[in-house]
């Protein structure tokens, strides 16, 4: 059998084992996860690099001077007005000249301080970016290198041991079951009226402030997390596993974990996390769009066992009319998910997020479920303004978490099926006489 056929056949076994491990085991408490190791590596590497790439001295002075440029200009205007008054009084000519000389010297010093502050800022930015780039390289080399070594050792002992080990690794890197369980941990308290319990549960899976959220806001946060992480947590790593096996999976998870830990636009990581954030955008560019298209396709099958909500606000009429009409509460509704609305909202809103990738699956989910997602959100006590996606024909309810999870599962299974079908075709073509 040709080498390509053998590799494709082994990859099929790896994917099947990964699916079994993910669905059967998930991420139980107390069981070590590879991402924990990657996270510890990132933290220690960051600490070492921050000591190596020291922030230039004068950072406090930099902020003081830059923030007070306007005060210096105001002082200049006040001094100019005082000069005009002094020149009218000949008795104070000498004093005015001395004062002007002192002021000119002070202006020169202020200008020099501002220039030094700007130079310090540029130097600090360069050091931070360089340190962040080095961190990305070190983490990727260490994580993928260790996995390569371990898998090679397993294959050397026995080829099937290598396949099983790689399949278990891939299964641990997927988050289908764990994300479903985390989402249901939010849904169940909401259905029972336990808003505080749901708030505690949702705080475990989102980065936003959860204290301001009411029941609808909690359900909305859970739906957004499931929709976004359909790609980040399941289909994107699966995409790279189909192409490159366990090495592709660990490489992607390392990039994604770095973005999650240091890819923030705050004072600490604005420059240090630039390399990680941009690499994550590149790695997710194709998987996020593929996930969105697959999610649109699975909307062709109606939900079963989930009651359809009443949509009472507006629906889009035919293209020829191109306008909206009001609906009465007793108007018959199309069953969810709505494939046409999913495609329409995806085309319209997929670029509304600051990230080039995160709104891809979120916009599909918003359209399919007739919801309005994103919008203003609180992070660390500060309100962040975000564009809204979707038409919001109805309020978000706890059962929408179930619907979002169903879309995630369907999308993931479809990608599994496509990947295995492609690999089977590759085996057949490689063995063609």
Task: List the predicted regions and their residue ranges.
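Hydrophobic alpha-helical transmembrane segments
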Residues: 2-67, 74-77, 116-251, 263-319, ...
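Small/flexible residues
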Residues: 61, 81, 323-325
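Intrinsically disordered, low-complexity repeat regions of secreted/extracellular protein precursors
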Residues: 67-121
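Substrate/ligand-engaging "lid" and interaction regions
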Residues: 256
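Glycine-rich phosphate/dinucleotide-binding loop and adjoining beta-alpha-beta core of small-molecule
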Residues: 259-260
């Amino acid at each position: 059998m040709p080498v390509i056929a053998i590799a494709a056949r082994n990859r099929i076994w790896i994917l099947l084992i990964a699916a079994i491990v993910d669905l059967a085991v998930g991420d139980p408490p107390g069981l070590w996860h590879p991402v924990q190791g990657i996270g510890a590596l990132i933290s220690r590497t960051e600490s070492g690099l921050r000591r190596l790439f020291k922030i230039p001295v004068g950072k406090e002075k930099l902020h003081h001077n830059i923030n007070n440029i306007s005060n210096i200009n105001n002082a200049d205007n006040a001094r100019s007005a005082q000069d005009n008054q002094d020149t009218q009084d000949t008795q104070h000519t000498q004093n005015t000249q001395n004062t002007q000389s002192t002021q000119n010297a002070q202006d020169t010093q202020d200008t020099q301080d501002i220039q030094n502050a700007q130079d310090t800022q540029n130097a600090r930015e360069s050091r931070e970016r360089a340190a962040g780039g080095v961190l990305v390289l070190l983490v990727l080399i260490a994580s993928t290198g260790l996995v390569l070594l371990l898998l090679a050792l397993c294959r050397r002992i026995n080829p099937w041991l290598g396949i099983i080990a790689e399949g278990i690794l891939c299964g641990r890197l997927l988050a289908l079951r764990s994300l479903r369980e985390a989402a249901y941990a939010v849904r169940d308290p909401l259905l029972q009226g336990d808003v505080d319990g749901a708030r505690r549960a949702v705080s475990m899976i989102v980065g936003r402030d959860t204290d301001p959220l009411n029941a609808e806001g909690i359900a909305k946060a859970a739906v957004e997390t499931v929709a976004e992480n359909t790609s980040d947590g399941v289909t994107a790593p699966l995409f790279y596993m189909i192409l490159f096996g366990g090495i592709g999976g660990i490489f992607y998870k390392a990039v994604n974990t770095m973005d999650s830990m240091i890819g923030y636009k705050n004072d600490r990581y604005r420059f240090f996390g630039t390399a990680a954030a941009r690499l994550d955008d590149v790695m997710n560019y194709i998987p996020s769009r593929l996930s969105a298209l697959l999610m649109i396709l699975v909307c062709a099958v109606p939900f079963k066992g989930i009651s359809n909500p009443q949509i009472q606000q507006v629906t889009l009429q035919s293209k020829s009319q191109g306008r909206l009409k009001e609906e009465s509460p007793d108007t018959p509704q199309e069953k969810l998910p709505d494939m046409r609305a999913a495609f329409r909202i995806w085309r319209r809103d997929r670029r509304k997020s600051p990230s080039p990738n995160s709104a891809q699956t979120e916009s599909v989910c918003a359209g399919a479920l007739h919801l309005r997602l994103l919008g203003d959100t609180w992070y660390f006590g500060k309100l962040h303004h975000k564009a809204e996606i979707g038409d919001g024909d109805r309020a978000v309810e706890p059962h929408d978490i179930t619907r979002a999870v169903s879309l995630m599962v369907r999308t993931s299974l479809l990608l599994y099926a496509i990947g295995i079908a492609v690999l089977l075709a590759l085996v057949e073509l490689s063995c063609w006489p």
